């Protein structure tokens, strides 16, 4: 079975990319167990708790990331440099457990995947 990587690069509100990526991720989990999830650039905001999307008339889908372990999706990575550029750190609380890696290590991990989908 092919290994599939989901890369979140967009902020959670303002576009539907994050929600669509999460929907695709959950759907793909029925087809393969070889899934990796990567958060880089503004995508690091996808898994920050305490957001209030209703204030900008958006749907709150962020808490749905919490179900990933129930779907056996446990390989989740976040870009250390992206966090630092946005004033965050790897010690910050996120809605899921993620492993912080530098950009070079993230590229190496992504090279292991047959298919890379970016949202």
Swiss-Prot record:
Location, primary (coarse class): cytoplasm
Gene Ontology CC, one term: cytoplasm
Keywords for this protein: Cytoplasm, tRNA processing
GO terms classed as biological process: tRNA processing
Keyword Kinase: no
Pfam families for this protein: DsrE
Statement: the UniProt record of this protein carries the keyword tRNA processing: yes
Subunit structure: Heterohexamer, formed by a dimer of trimers. The hexameric TusBCD complex contains 2 copies each of TusB, TusC and TusD. The TusBCD complex interacts with TusE.
Family according to the record: Belongs to the DsrF/TusC family.
Cited function: Part of a sulfur-relay system required for 2-thiolation of 5-methylaminomethyl-2-thiouridine (mnm(5)s(2)U) at tRNA wobble positions.
Record's protein name: Protein TusC
Species: Cronobacter sakazakii (strain ATCC BAA-894)
Gene: tusC
């Amino acid at each position: 079975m092919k290994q599939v990587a989901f890369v979140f690069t967009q902020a959670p509100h303002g576009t539907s990319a994050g929600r669509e990526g999460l929907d695709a991720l959950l759907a793909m989990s029925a087809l393969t167990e070889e899934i990796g999830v990567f958060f880089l650039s503004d995508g690091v905001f996808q898994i920050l708790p305490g957001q209030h999307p209703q204030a900008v008339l958006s749907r709150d889908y962020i808490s749905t990331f919490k179900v990933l372990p129930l779907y056996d999706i446990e390989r989740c990575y976040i870009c250390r440099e992206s966090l630092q550029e946005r004033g965050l750190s790897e010690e910050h609380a996120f809605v899921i457990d993620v492993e912080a890696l530098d950009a070079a290590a993230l590229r190496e991990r992504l090279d292991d995947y047959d298919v890379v989908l970016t949202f």
